Protein backbone atom coordinates (compact mmCIF):
# COMPACT_ATOMS: atom_id res chain seq x y z
CA UNK A 1 0.00 0.00 0.00
CA UNK A 2 2.83 2.41 0.80
CA UNK A 3 4.50 1.53 -2.48
CA UNK A 4 1.36 2.38 -4.39
CA UNK A 5 1.04 5.70 -2.56
CA UNK A 6 4.66 6.55 -3.36
CA UNK A 7 4.14 5.68 -7.01
CA UNK A 8 1.01 7.81 -7.17
CA UNK A 9 2.70 10.75 -5.47
CA UNK A 10 5.75 10.50 -7.74
CA UNK A 11 3.55 10.29 -10.83
CA UNK A 12 1.57 13.33 -9.71
CA UNK A 13 4.80 15.21 -9.05
CA UNK A 14 3.84 16.40 -5.58
CA UNK A 15 6.86 17.11 -3.43
CA UNK A 16 4.96 17.88 -0.17
CA UNK A 17 5.44 15.06 2.36
CA UNK A 18 2.25 13.30 3.50
CA UNK A 19 1.66 12.43 7.15
CA UNK A 20 2.52 8.93 8.20
CA UNK A 21 -0.94 8.28 9.71
CA UNK A 22 -3.33 9.96 7.37
CA UNK A 23 -6.39 7.99 8.47
CA UNK A 24 -6.05 8.65 12.21
CA UNK A 25 -8.66 11.11 13.49
CA UNK A 26 -7.28 14.08 15.39
CA UNK A 27 -9.04 17.24 16.57
CA UNK A 28 -7.73 18.98 13.48
CA UNK A 29 -9.02 16.31 11.12
CA UNK A 30 -12.57 15.64 12.27
CA UNK A 31 -14.90 15.43 9.24
CA UNK A 32 -18.16 17.27 9.03
CA UNK A 33 -21.21 15.37 10.20
CA UNK A 34 -23.15 14.21 7.18
CA UNK A 35 -26.27 12.05 6.97
CA UNK A 36 -26.32 10.27 3.62
CA UNK A 37 -29.71 10.44 1.93
CA UNK A 38 -31.58 7.31 1.01
CA UNK A 39 -31.53 6.80 -2.72
CA UNK A 40 -35.03 6.56 -4.21
CA UNK A 41 -36.10 3.62 -6.31
CA UNK A 42 -35.32 4.08 -10.02
CA UNK A 43 -38.93 3.59 -11.05
CA UNK A 44 -40.50 6.05 -8.59
CA UNK A 45 -40.84 9.71 -9.41
CA UNK A 46 -41.35 12.31 -6.71
CA UNK A 47 -44.07 14.87 -7.04
CA UNK A 48 -42.96 18.44 -7.75
CA UNK A 49 -44.49 19.69 -4.50
CA UNK A 50 -42.58 17.18 -2.39
CA UNK A 51 -39.38 17.66 -4.35
CA UNK A 52 -39.57 21.36 -3.64
CA UNK A 53 -40.38 20.86 0.04
CA UNK A 54 -37.67 18.26 0.68
CA UNK A 55 -34.25 19.55 -0.43
CA UNK A 56 -31.72 16.73 -0.60
CA UNK A 57 -28.59 18.59 0.41
CA UNK A 58 -25.84 17.46 2.72
CA UNK A 59 -25.09 19.27 5.96
CA UNK A 60 -21.39 19.32 5.13
CA UNK A 61 -21.83 21.82 2.32
CA UNK A 62 -20.48 25.27 3.07
CA UNK A 63 -23.17 27.39 1.46
CA UNK A 64 -26.59 27.95 2.98
CA UNK A 65 -29.84 27.14 1.30
CA UNK A 66 -31.79 30.00 -0.19
CA UNK A 67 -35.00 30.77 1.62
CA UNK A 68 -37.77 33.29 1.35
CA UNK A 69 -37.91 36.47 3.37
CA UNK A 70 -41.07 35.52 5.28
CA UNK A 71 -39.85 32.02 6.13
CA UNK A 72 -38.28 33.00 9.45
CA UNK A 73 -41.59 34.30 10.76
CA UNK A 74 -43.25 30.88 10.78
CA UNK A 75 -40.26 28.73 11.77
CA UNK A 76 -37.99 28.81 14.78
CA UNK A 77 -35.80 25.81 14.02
CA UNK A 78 -33.95 26.98 10.94
CA UNK A 79 -30.64 25.18 11.12
CA UNK A 80 -28.81 23.68 8.13
CA UNK A 81 -27.87 20.47 9.89
CA UNK A 82 -31.25 19.85 11.47
CA UNK A 83 -32.98 20.69 8.23
CA UNK A 84 -30.71 18.27 6.40
CA UNK A 85 -31.68 15.51 8.80
CA UNK A 86 -35.36 16.44 8.76
CA UNK A 87 -35.42 16.47 4.98
CA UNK A 88 -34.83 12.73 4.82
CA UNK A 89 -38.22 11.05 4.52
CA UNK A 90 -37.18 7.77 6.14
CA UNK A 91 -36.27 9.35 9.52
CA UNK A 92 -39.18 9.57 11.99
CA UNK A 93 -39.89 12.95 13.52
CA UNK A 94 -42.12 14.38 16.21
CA UNK A 95 -43.46 17.82 16.98
CA UNK A 96 -42.05 19.34 20.16
CA UNK A 97 -43.84 21.49 22.69
CA UNK A 98 -42.37 24.64 21.11
CA UNK A 99 -44.11 24.03 17.80
CA UNK A 100 -41.28 22.81 15.57
CA UNK A 101 -40.20 19.34 14.52
CA UNK A 102 -37.32 17.28 15.83
CA UNK A 103 -35.96 13.83 15.15
CA UNK A 104 -37.67 11.09 17.11
CA UNK A 105 -34.36 9.26 17.52
CA UNK A 106 -30.86 9.47 16.15
CA UNK A 107 -30.37 7.89 12.72
CA UNK A 108 -27.27 6.02 13.93
CA UNK A 109 -28.19 5.05 17.51
CA UNK A 110 -31.35 4.03 19.32
CA UNK A 111 -32.39 5.59 22.58
CA UNK A 112 -33.11 3.59 25.69
CA UNK A 113 -36.73 4.66 25.56
CA UNK A 114 -37.18 3.26 22.07
CA UNK A 115 -35.65 -0.03 23.16
CA UNK A 116 -38.01 -0.29 26.14
CA UNK A 117 -41.09 0.73 24.20
CA UNK A 118 -40.30 -1.38 21.18
CA UNK A 119 -42.70 -4.19 20.50
CA UNK A 120 -42.48 -6.74 17.70
CA UNK A 121 -40.47 -5.51 14.73
CA UNK A 122 -42.71 -3.64 12.34
CA UNK A 123 -41.94 -1.61 9.22
CA UNK A 124 -41.19 1.97 10.17
CA UNK A 125 -43.69 4.47 8.73
CA UNK A 126 -42.40 7.14 6.42
CA UNK A 127 -42.53 10.69 7.71
CA UNK A 128 -43.59 13.76 5.79
CA UNK A 129 -42.05 17.19 5.96
CA UNK A 130 -42.86 19.52 8.82
CA UNK A 131 -44.03 22.38 6.67
CA UNK A 132 -45.09 20.37 3.65
CA UNK A 133 -48.62 19.82 2.56
CA UNK A 134 -50.69 16.70 2.97
CA UNK A 135 -49.28 13.66 1.26
CA UNK A 136 -49.56 9.90 1.28
CA UNK A 137 -47.28 9.65 4.33
CA UNK A 138 -48.41 8.88 7.87
CA UNK A 139 -49.26 11.80 10.19
CA UNK A 140 -46.92 12.93 12.91
CA UNK A 141 -49.18 11.54 15.62
CA UNK A 142 -48.26 8.01 14.58
CA UNK A 143 -44.53 8.70 14.92
CA UNK A 144 -44.39 9.19 18.66
CA UNK A 145 -43.08 5.68 19.16
CA UNK A 146 -44.55 2.20 18.96
CA UNK A 147 -47.72 1.91 20.95
CA UNK A 148 -49.26 -1.21 22.33
CA UNK A 149 -52.82 -2.24 21.68
CA UNK A 150 -55.23 -0.26 23.74
CA UNK A 151 -57.98 2.33 23.59
CA UNK A 152 -57.13 5.32 21.49
CA UNK A 153 -56.96 8.61 23.34
CA UNK A 154 -57.84 11.92 21.66
CA UNK A 155 -54.91 14.13 20.82
CA UNK A 156 -54.40 17.55 22.33
CA UNK A 157 -55.78 20.50 20.33
CA UNK A 158 -52.32 22.04 20.02
CA UNK A 159 -50.84 19.05 18.21
CA UNK A 160 -50.24 15.32 18.47
CA UNK A 161 -49.28 13.52 21.62
CA UNK A 162 -45.94 14.33 23.18
CA UNK A 163 -43.17 11.77 23.36
CA UNK A 164 -43.19 12.08 27.16
CA UNK A 165 -46.70 10.60 27.20
CA UNK A 166 -45.55 7.66 25.17
CA UNK A 167 -42.59 7.15 27.49
CA UNK A 168 -44.74 7.40 30.60
CA UNK A 169 -47.12 4.74 29.29
CA UNK A 170 -44.29 2.36 28.49
CA UNK A 171 -43.71 0.79 31.92
CA UNK A 172 -47.41 -0.08 32.15
CA UNK A 173 -47.21 -2.21 29.04
CA UNK A 174 -43.76 -3.62 29.83
CA UNK A 175 -44.44 -4.49 33.44
CA UNK A 176 -41.82 -6.85 34.81
CA UNK A 177 -42.66 -9.95 36.79
CA UNK A 178 -41.87 -9.44 40.44
CA UNK A 179 -41.35 -12.13 43.04
CA UNK A 180 -43.96 -11.81 45.82
CA UNK A 181 -42.67 -10.75 49.19
CA UNK A 182 -42.10 -13.56 51.64
CA UNK A 183 -42.22 -16.27 48.98
CA UNK A 184 -39.25 -18.12 50.45
CA UNK A 185 -40.59 -17.96 53.98
CA UNK A 186 -43.99 -19.22 52.84
CA UNK A 187 -42.34 -22.08 51.00
CA UNK A 188 -40.39 -23.06 54.11
CA UNK A 189 -43.48 -22.88 56.27
CA UNK A 190 -45.42 -24.93 53.76
CA UNK A 191 -42.77 -27.64 53.88
CA UNK A 192 -43.05 -27.88 57.65
CA UNK A 193 -46.82 -27.67 57.75
CA UNK A 194 -47.20 -30.35 55.08
CA UNK A 195 -45.92 -32.93 57.55
CA UNK A 196 -48.37 -31.84 60.21
CA UNK A 197 -51.34 -31.14 57.95
CA UNK A 198 -52.88 -34.52 58.68
CA UNK A 199 -52.92 -33.97 62.40
CA UNK A 200 -53.85 -30.33 62.68
CA UNK A 201 -57.21 -29.35 63.99
CA UNK A 202 -59.84 -28.53 61.43
CA UNK A 203 -60.19 -24.80 61.02
CA UNK A 204 -63.17 -22.92 62.27
CA UNK A 205 -64.32 -22.41 58.69
CA UNK A 206 -64.75 -26.15 58.21
CA UNK A 207 -66.61 -26.39 61.47
CA UNK A 208 -68.96 -23.62 60.40
CA UNK A 209 -69.43 -25.39 57.09
CA UNK A 210 -70.28 -28.61 58.85
CA UNK A 211 -72.70 -26.88 61.14
CA UNK A 212 -74.31 -25.11 58.20
CA UNK A 213 -74.59 -28.33 56.21
CA UNK A 214 -75.90 -30.19 59.22
CA UNK A 215 -78.51 -27.54 59.89
CA UNK A 216 -79.61 -27.51 56.24
CA UNK A 217 -79.93 -31.28 55.93
CA UNK A 218 -82.82 -31.63 58.42
CA UNK A 219 -84.61 -28.76 56.71
CA UNK A 220 -84.23 -30.37 53.29
CA UNK A 221 -85.41 -33.80 54.44
CA UNK A 222 -89.10 -32.88 55.04
CA UNK A 223 -89.27 -30.92 51.77
CA UNK A 224 -87.82 -33.77 49.71
CA UNK A 225 -89.93 -36.48 51.35
CA UNK A 226 -92.82 -34.89 53.23
CA UNK A 227 -94.66 -38.23 53.63
CA UNK A 228 -91.76 -40.06 55.24
CA UNK A 229 -92.32 -40.92 58.87
CA UNK A 230 -88.57 -41.13 59.69
CA UNK A 231 -87.37 -38.50 62.14
CA UNK A 232 -84.80 -35.99 60.78
CA UNK A 233 -81.19 -36.75 61.53
CA UNK A 234 -79.56 -34.75 64.29
CA UNK A 235 -77.05 -32.06 63.45
CA UNK A 236 -74.11 -34.15 64.67
CA UNK A 237 -73.33 -37.09 66.91
CA UNK A 238 -70.70 -36.63 69.60
CA UNK A 239 -69.28 -39.02 72.16
CA UNK A 240 -66.14 -39.63 74.20
CA UNK A 241 -64.52 -42.93 74.95
CA UNK A 242 -61.41 -44.69 76.24
CA UNK A 243 -59.30 -47.17 74.30
CA UNK A 244 -57.29 -49.66 76.35
CA UNK A 245 -53.85 -50.22 74.81
CA UNK A 246 -53.37 -53.77 76.11
CA UNK A 247 -51.01 -52.94 78.97
CA UNK A 248 -51.84 -52.48 82.61
CA UNK A 249 -53.29 -49.03 83.07
CA UNK A 250 -52.39 -47.75 79.60
CA UNK A 251 -55.33 -46.06 77.90
CA UNK A 252 -56.11 -43.36 75.39
CA UNK A 253 -58.92 -40.87 75.69
CA UNK A 254 -60.55 -39.80 72.43
CA UNK A 255 -63.68 -38.01 71.24
CA UNK A 256 -65.69 -39.04 68.18
CA UNK A 257 -67.90 -36.74 66.16
CA UNK A 258 -69.96 -37.61 63.09
CA UNK A 259 -71.94 -35.18 60.93
CA UNK A 260 -74.53 -36.88 58.67
CA UNK A 261 -74.84 -33.80 56.45
CA UNK A 262 -71.20 -33.69 55.41
CA UNK A 263 -70.58 -37.44 55.96
CA UNK A 264 -67.44 -36.63 57.92
CA UNK A 265 -66.10 -38.57 60.87
CA UNK A 266 -63.75 -36.72 63.18
CA UNK A 267 -61.69 -38.45 65.83
CA UNK A 268 -59.91 -36.22 68.32
CA UNK A 269 -57.10 -37.58 70.45
CA UNK A 270 -57.37 -35.94 73.84
CA UNK A 271 -54.66 -37.40 76.06
CA UNK A 272 -52.83 -40.57 77.01
CA UNK A 273 -53.12 -42.10 80.47
CA UNK A 274 -50.16 -43.99 82.05
CA UNK A 275 -48.58 -44.48 78.64
CA UNK A 276 -45.10 -43.52 79.83
CA UNK A 277 -45.12 -44.93 83.34
CA UNK A 278 -41.71 -46.61 83.00
CA UNK A 279 -39.97 -43.77 81.16
CA UNK A 280 -36.83 -42.57 82.96
CA UNK A 281 -37.23 -38.90 82.08
CA UNK A 282 -39.17 -36.38 80.07
CA UNK A 283 -36.50 -36.31 77.35
CA UNK A 284 -37.18 -39.98 76.53
CA UNK A 285 -40.95 -39.51 76.24
CA UNK A 286 -41.69 -39.62 72.52
CA UNK A 287 -44.77 -41.33 71.15
CA UNK A 288 -46.61 -41.57 67.85
CA UNK A 289 -50.16 -42.90 67.39
CA UNK A 290 -51.60 -44.44 64.25
CA UNK A 291 -55.31 -44.93 63.59
CA UNK A 292 -56.81 -47.46 61.20
CA UNK A 293 -60.47 -47.79 60.30
CA UNK A 294 -61.53 -51.40 59.96
CA UNK A 295 -62.82 -53.61 58.25
CA UNK A 296 -60.09 -53.86 55.60
CA UNK A 297 -62.52 -53.10 52.80
CA UNK A 298 -62.71 -49.51 54.02
CA UNK A 299 -59.32 -49.33 55.70
CA UNK A 300 -57.99 -45.80 56.05
CA UNK A 301 -54.76 -45.09 57.86
CA UNK A 302 -53.61 -41.85 59.45
CA UNK A 303 -50.73 -41.05 61.75
CA UNK A 304 -50.36 -38.43 64.45
CA UNK A 305 -47.49 -36.11 65.17
CA UNK A 306 -44.77 -37.04 67.61
CA UNK A 307 -45.59 -36.11 71.18
CA UNK A 308 -42.55 -35.71 73.38
CA UNK A 309 -40.87 -33.99 76.32
CA UNK A 310 -43.94 -34.25 78.51
CA UNK A 311 -45.09 -36.91 80.97
CA UNK A 312 -48.67 -35.71 80.59
CA UNK A 313 -49.12 -36.36 76.90
CA UNK A 314 -51.83 -34.06 75.57
CA UNK A 315 -52.47 -34.65 71.89
CA UNK A 316 -55.46 -32.48 70.94
CA UNK A 317 -55.15 -33.65 67.35
CA UNK A 318 -57.92 -34.38 64.88
CA UNK A 319 -58.27 -37.21 62.37
CA UNK A 320 -60.93 -36.59 59.73
CA UNK A 321 -62.41 -39.28 57.47
CA UNK A 322 -64.73 -38.02 54.73
CA UNK A 323 -67.31 -39.80 52.62
CA UNK A 324 -68.63 -42.19 55.26
CA UNK A 325 -72.30 -43.00 55.40
CA UNK A 326 -74.18 -43.77 58.58
CA UNK A 327 -74.26 -47.49 57.83
CA UNK A 328 -70.51 -47.58 57.26
CA UNK A 329 -69.82 -45.77 60.52
CA UNK A 330 -72.06 -48.24 62.34
CA UNK A 331 -69.93 -51.16 61.10
CA UNK A 332 -66.53 -49.53 61.46
CA UNK A 333 -64.06 -49.84 64.30
CA UNK A 334 -60.95 -47.78 64.97
CA UNK A 335 -57.67 -49.48 65.86
CA UNK A 336 -55.06 -47.41 67.67
CA UNK A 337 -51.36 -48.26 67.86
CA UNK A 338 -48.79 -46.45 70.00
CA UNK A 339 -45.12 -46.67 69.05
CA UNK A 340 -42.06 -45.34 70.80
CA UNK A 341 -40.29 -42.64 68.78
CA UNK A 342 -37.34 -42.25 71.14
CA UNK A 343 -33.69 -42.83 70.42
CA UNK A 344 -31.59 -45.95 70.35
CA UNK A 345 -32.81 -49.51 70.10
CA UNK A 346 -36.23 -48.71 71.53
CA UNK A 347 -37.16 -46.58 68.55
CA UNK A 348 -40.24 -48.02 66.84
CA UNK A 349 -41.09 -50.31 69.77
CA UNK A 350 -44.79 -51.05 70.08
CA UNK A 351 -46.10 -49.56 73.32
CA UNK A 352 -49.64 -50.88 72.97
CA UNK A 353 -52.65 -51.19 70.71
CA UNK A 354 -56.40 -51.23 71.13
CA UNK A 355 -59.66 -51.23 69.19
CA UNK A 356 -62.94 -49.40 69.68
CA UNK A 357 -66.25 -49.84 67.86
CA UNK A 358 -67.62 -46.58 66.50
CA UNK A 359 -71.21 -47.84 66.36
CA UNK A 360 -71.22 -48.58 70.08
CA UNK A 361 -69.47 -45.32 70.86
CA UNK A 362 -71.84 -43.09 68.86
CA UNK A 363 -74.94 -45.20 69.74
CA UNK A 364 -75.85 -45.75 66.10
Swiss-Prot record:
Biological role: May be involved in inflammatory process. May regulate cell architecture and adhesion.
Predominant place of localization: nucleus
InterPro entries (UniProt xref): C2_Ca-dependent_4 (IPR039208), C2_dom (IPR000008), C2_domain_sf (IPR035892)
Name under which the protein is recorded: C2 calcium-dependent domain-containing protein 4B
Domain C2: 248-364
Domain of life of the native organism: Eukaryota
SUPFAM superfamilies in the cross-refs: C2 domain (Calcium/lipid-binding domain, CaLB)
Amino acid sequence: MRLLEKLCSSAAGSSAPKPAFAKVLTPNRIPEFCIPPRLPAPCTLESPIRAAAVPRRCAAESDLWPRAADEDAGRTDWDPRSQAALSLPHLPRVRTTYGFCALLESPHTRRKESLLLGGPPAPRPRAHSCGGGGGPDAPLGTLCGPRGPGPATPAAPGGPRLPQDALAAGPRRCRLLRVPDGLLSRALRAGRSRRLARVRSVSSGNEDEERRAGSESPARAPSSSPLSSRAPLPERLEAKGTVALGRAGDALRLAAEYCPGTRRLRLRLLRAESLFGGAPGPRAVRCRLSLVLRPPGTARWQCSAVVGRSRKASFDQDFCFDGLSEDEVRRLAVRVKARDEGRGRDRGRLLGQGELSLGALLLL
